[in-house]
Amino acid sequence: MTTVSSDRIRIKLKAYDYRILDKAVAEIVDTARNTGAGVAGPIPLPTNIHKFTVNRSVHVDKKSREQFEMRIHKRLMDILEPTQQTVDALGKLSLPAGVDVEIKL
């Protein structure tokens, strides 16, 4: 078994919808375990909530406002002792649209 130079691969995933984020995490975990690497996580990180308040009307009624929010869900996971086969399989993996992936070796 040839291992990659580092001891782990750290993967940070972000998405607006937690359901597609969990599907992406499940695919990564299955791929890593099928190639013989260990997996630590997924660790749910705090959700960022961006709130926007706007006036409902254009000119009057300052008291009438509407609030919108944007939630960014995040997960962190480590692939422990990855092999070259693990790195190749993760590179070929197609994840759902809307998932932002950051990989650190």
From Swiss-Prot:
Gene3D superfamilies, per database record: Ribosomal protein S10 domain
Similarity comment text for this entry: Belongs to the universal ribosomal protein uS10 family.
GO molecular-function term, one example from the UniProt record: tRNA binding
Biological process according to GO: translation
Keywords associated with the record: Ribonucleoprotein, Ribosomal protein
PANTHER family the UniProt entry points to: 30S RIBOSOMAL PROTEIN S10 FAMILY MEMBER (PTHR11700)
Function according to Swiss-Prot or TrEMBL: Involved in the binding of tRNA to the ribosomes.
HAMAP family (alphabetical): Ribosomal_uS10
NCBIfam families per record: PRK00596.1, rpsJ_bact
Source species of the chain: Oleidesulfovibrio alaskensis (strain ATCC BAA-1058 / DSM 17464 / G20)
This protein's GO CC annotations: ribonucleoprotein complex; ribosome
Classification via SUPFAM superfamilies: Ribosomal protein S10
Protein name per UniProt: Small ribosomal subunit protein uS10
Subunit structure, as described in the record: Part of the 30S ribosomal subunit.
